[in-house]
Amino acid sequence: MLSRKRKHGSPDAESNPSKKQITSLRSSPRRTTRQKENIPISLNSPQKIPSTPKKTQRAFLLESPPKRVSPRKAVLGAGTFYSKQKPLYLTPLERKVLKEAKSPPSVTNKEPSRPPLTAANQVVKPAKKVQKKPRASAPQSNLKGYFTAKPKATKSSSDKQTDQVLKSTMAPISFSSMKSKGKPKLVVGAAFFNTGKKPTSMYKKSAQNTKPKPTYEKPSIRKPVREKELVTAPGQRSPVRRAVFLKKQPEVEVSHDKRESTQAPMSPQVLADVHGITKELRVVLRRSVSPETGSQDAPSEADSVFDVSDLLLPDHDSSHDEEESSVYPIFGTKRPQKKGKLSPPLNSSTPSALTATPALKAKERSMLRREMKKQTDNQLIIDAGQKQFGATTCASCGMLYSTDSPEDNFQHTQFHQRFLDTIKFVGWKKERVVAEFWDGKIILVLPDDPKYATRKAEDVRRIADSELGFQQITLSSPSSAKTYLFINTDRMVVGCLVAENIRQAYRVLEQQEKQKDMSKEDFMEHHRTWCCSTVPEKALCGVSRIWVFSLMRRKSVATRLLDTARNTFMYGSHLTKEEIAFSDPTPQGKLFATKYCQTPTFLVYNFIS
């Protein structure tokens, strides 16, 4: 349809008045929608006017189209279908004239040649460029438009070159397609200097330089130098070998020369078999403190040993050290082996002694692990987020109990109330105060005192008996017993001492002190039975009970109670430490009596008899 209608009209076609009316009617709707001319739908036949009849659908494919009503409408030119402000289409003759008219020097700076405008090219071309370049309707104006110089911003040649390079290096970004674009390459080389050479990529150039040329002459040159270092290395590492090998230096050089001449690879085992010396002898010589005395005692053995050590060490140890010198010391595999070899003592020269030390260490480690496992306690209580978890000591009564056990809580409640009621001291009208201190006072209770006083003393004695482990038995002479109570500033009974009259006592036999082994049962030594002599000694005051509240211990409460009892037990006399005796002391009481009397041979008596 388009190829048949694209005919140039006659020169007077545009001057025809009838055509002017038709073109004005046809072009007016096209000019209002100039920006939609790139849409392919706009290239179809022009909009029909009301005078044109509607197209009827064909019944058959071979049926001819209906004839037009007016014969004048067939004379319309192809230019009426396009905007007259875009005469960008150039005929082949115009393109040839344009190419010949332009000068050759301006080829490098001219813009790229524009392709002929077809229907497809007009669709792709953006509409913004069309509005910037209004042209005349005549085709000759196209040539003038190309030759006229356009006003542009002044830019230097270097700026233009850099702009071209940046435009070429920028990678196109596409969001509609799913294909991934390659990374942009930085172009370096001749493109910056405006030469005709092809630009090269920076990445290709660096990849070519990374391959070094193989050199085969360096190993042969460094080989004799390394052998010289291996010979001198043992003397630098071990001061023992340096001191001993000074005497036999010529022999070492001869053997080294022989080895260089033969250059036969011999393993350390073969060399050891040839000289008849094992590896352990070499290690012992390295560990020896006085090599000169050993060489003087056995010169023949020392010579043979030194030869083998000189042959083996440069070949074996130094080569490994040279290879491992490039590795950080802690990552080497040779050093832990050397440390294990040097661990035995200096005087051990047998292979069994060298291997026995690691076994003993392993056995000791296993024993330590077993002991640690025995000491660890198993968890028998589930931690479910309780506020109070595990064993707890009451701050008031001092009882140790488990808070998450109902039975322990019940027992603690009963004991706590009974204990507080017992040790609470409300005060009496007639108090027999025998001593006063900054943190409390000591009250003496006699058997002839009122009932409230004797009842209070009896209650405190029962608590003391329960904590000390005694049975609830009566005193041997209750009529002569005296009770001393220590009352603190909070008006609580925190200490009790029961003293009675005695006539004789027995001295504890002194036992030899042994070194205690805490891993065995010796840590229970103070819980063991004690022995006393059968020879009675004279004593006047017997300490039947002495008890201190658990939360008030280590505050000299028992010492002050005993000092007060010595001063007030007998009227008008002060008893010495040799005149008092303790009745069947507990382990803690034995320690206290030894410290108080300043001797382990203190006096004891049995309060039951």
From Swiss-Prot:
CCHH-type zinc-finger residues: 392-416
Substrates-to-products reaction catalysed: L-lysyl-[protein] + acetyl-CoA = N(6)-acetyl-L-lysyl-[protein] + CoA + H(+)
E.C. number(s) listed in UniProt: 2.3.1.-
Broad enzyme group: transferase
Keyword Nucleus applies: yes
Keywords: Acyltransferase, Cell cycle, Chromosome, Metal-binding, Nucleus, Transferase, Zinc, Zinc-finger
Chain positions covered by the region annotation Disordered: 1-71, 100-165, 197-241, 314-357
Top-level taxon of the source organism: Eukaryota
PANTHER family the record matches: N-ACETYLTRANSFERASE ECO, N-ACETYLTRANSFERASE ESCO2
UniProt domain comment: The N-terminal region seems to be responsible for association with chromosomes, thus excluding any involvement of the Zn finger in this process.
Family according to the record: Belongs to the acetyltransferase family. ECO subfamily.
Protein name per the record: N-acetyltransferase ESCO2
Species this chain originates from: Danio rerio (Zebrafish)
Gene behind this protein: esco2
